[in-house]
Every structure is written in C-alpha cells, then in structure tokens.
C-alpha cells in the first residue's frame, strides 16, 4: 500500500456509507437497521472518548456497586452501559435490550418501540482498564416478530437468527468490526474526522493458524480434549513447529487478533466453571457469528455455537472459535472422547 498516496485519499468509505450501500442491496429494507447501527456507532464513539480520557477524568476506579455477574462495577462500566441503553432506546428501533451489566432485560416503552432486540456487553475486559490494555464493546442484533407483545422468550433465540453482530475495540486505535450477514468488515475511527473509515474490507480468517489463545492458569481443571489440544499445540507429534501462545485476557482483543492472524481462541468448561465462563447472548453468539462470516468456525464442545438455544439471558457456555481447521481438530478430539 502506498501510504503517502493513502494520506491524501478523499474517496473514503465511512461506516455510514457502507451500511447505506448494504441497505440498498435489499429492496425491502426500510432503513431501520441502518438507523439502529448509526446509534450503536455513536455509542462507540462516546465510549472511545471516555476510555481515552479515563485516567484524567477520574473515571477509573470502583463505583461501589456490584453487577449481576458478581463483578464490582467500575465507573467506566456504569457510564458505558448508560450510554448504550440511551443510544439504543432513543433510536426508536429497539423493543428489548439485554446488557451484561443489568440483571433483567430492559423492555422499551411502547411509544419508542421498534422491531429489534440488542444484546450487548458495554465494556468487555474492563478489569484491564487500569493498565491500558485493549477493551471493547460487543453487540448482537435480532429481529423480534411482534414488538407489541415482546417477551423474554423472544430474546432467547439461537445465535444463527442474528441479523447483525459486531464489536468495537478501544486500543491503540479504535476499531469497529461489523457483519450484517454478508461478510465481515473492519472500520477504524479517524479522530480528526470523527468518522469510522473502512480499513479492513472483507476480512477472511486463515484456514489454519499458528497461534492459540487460552488462559493456561486453568489447565489443571480442563477436560481431556482441551488438555490434549493444548498439548498438541505445544508439542506437535508430526514434527511441525509448535503454535505460539497469545493471551491478553480481554475477549475483544484476543478474538480480534485471532480473526486477523488466524489460530484459535478457547475458553473451555472446567471443574471450576462446568458451564464455561463466557456469556452466550452477548459474548459467545456475536463473536461466533463474526467468525463464521469470516470463514472460521465456532464450537461449544458439544455443538455449533450458533445452534445453541439459551434458556436464560445471562447463560454461559464453553467456546472454541477461530480458524476452520483448528476448530475442526478440537471437534475431532471431542468426538473421539464421546465414542
């Protein structure tokens, strides 16, 4: 790429232009999803600004409340949740919201209701705020059949029903990765323009990667297939080079690297967390949707992740996602154990 020429490019594909182009492909589209996504983008810009100024503005530190997951809430968590709830409700396109920070689902006032449900984690990896490690927002969007009579059952859909999913990573740059079911694209926030610009068009994950990403501190509690897979990563029997371990501890950052470079991200079940640790609706499903759209796979240890039907809004699940061949290898190990 000619960076000098790139610096003077004037024909920039903004995220708004991209979403409008996608909308124009569907003759039946009325623009509701476009409006909803524009409100999510605004929320991401707001949170990106707050994250950048957190230390200076004294937003770092505990807020003195505990969320539904039993984690002490940090000021930025609380702020980010408020920002996204207000942005989503004010769009007039949502009827129910599920946030990682709120114990109950939020049902939108009938006068402001639209046809979408949004499940989101407003600030994933927030324990990393104090040390400047990348953190992010994750979201998944579903269509609701009857917005006038929406119930909790409407929220508990399998991930394959999602119409769009994405995440925004607040790191060395602010990157928003989005799929509306037609591939995956990455946009980077240009602070001078205040716009997300298309920088990673049509992301495709490599078929096989050289990296595995897992918290090896939990190794003593793993099941046999997970332990075998990690052992093969470190000590391959076929004479090939071992895989490199990369683990940040922020799901958005770890999945982002996996998506771009290939490999596999795993957060398996173990004796301490027999149902896994990551939440289905706003962590497992959106990331699995993106991974499949980019040509990868996602697996729970029992089934394709997007086929899972949750029974409660904060349900957890084990997850293995990444390059197609790497996840295929993990599926083979679980199939062998089941025989």
From Swiss-Prot:
Cofactor(s) it depends on: Mg(2+)
Main enzyme class: hydrolase
Binding site for substrate: 124-127, 215-218, 246-251, 267, 277-279
Residues annotated as binding Mg(2+) 1: 71, 100
InterPro entries: FBPase_C_dom, FBPase_class-1, FBPase_N, FBPtase, Fructose_bisphosphatase_AS
Role: Catalyzes the first irreversible reaction from fructose-1,6-bisphosphate to fructose-6-phosphate and inorganic phosphate and plays an important regulatory role in sucrose biosynthesis and metabolism. Required for sucrose supply and tiller bud outgrowth.
Protein name as catalogued: Fructose-1,6-bisphosphatase, cytosolic
Organism of this sequence: Oryza sativa subsp. japonica
Gene this protein is translated from: CFBP1
């Amino acid at each position: 790429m000619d960076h000098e020429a790139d610096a003077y490019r004037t024909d920039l594909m903004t995220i708004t232009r991209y979403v409008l182009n996608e909308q124009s492909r569907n003759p039946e589209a009325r623009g509701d999803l476009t409006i909803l996504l524009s409100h999510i983008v605004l929320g991401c810009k707001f949170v990106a600004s707050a994250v950048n100024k957190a230390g200076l503005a004294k937003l770092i530190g505990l807020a003195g409340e505990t969320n539904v997951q039993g984690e002490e809430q940090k000021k930025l968590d609380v702020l980010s949740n408020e920002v996204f709830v207000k942005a989503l409700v004010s769009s007039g396109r949502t009827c129910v919201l599920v946030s990682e920070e709120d114990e109950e689902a939020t049902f939108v006032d009938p006068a402001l209701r639209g046809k979408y449900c949004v499940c989101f984690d407003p600030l994933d990896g927030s324990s990393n705020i104090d040390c400047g490690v990348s953190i992010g927002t994750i979201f998944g969007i579903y269509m609701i059949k009857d917005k006038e009579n929406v119930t909790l059952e409407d929220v508990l859909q399998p991930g394959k029903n999602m119409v769009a999913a994405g995440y925004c990573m607040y790191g060395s740059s602010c990157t928003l990765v989005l799929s509306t079911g037609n591939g995956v694209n990455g946009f980077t926030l240009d602070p001078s323009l205040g716009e997300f610009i298309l920088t990673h068009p049509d992301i495709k994950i490599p078929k096989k990667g050289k990296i595995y990403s897992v918290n090896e501190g939990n190794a003593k509690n793993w099941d046999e297939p997970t332990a075998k897979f990690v052992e093969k990563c470190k000590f391959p029997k076929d004479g090939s080079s071992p895989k490199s371990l990369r683990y940040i501890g922020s799901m958005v950052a770890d999945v982002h690297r996996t998506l771009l470079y290939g490999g596999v991200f795993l957060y398996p079940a173990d004796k301490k967390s027999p149902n896994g640790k990551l939440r289905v609706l706003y962590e497992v499903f959106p990331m699995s949707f993106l991974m499949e759209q980019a040509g990868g796979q996602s697996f729970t240890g029992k089934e394709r992740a997007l086929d899972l039907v949750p029974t409660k809004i904060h349900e957890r699940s084990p997850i293995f996602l990444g390059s197609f061949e790497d996840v295929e290898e993990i599926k083979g190990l679980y199939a062998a154990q089941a025989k």
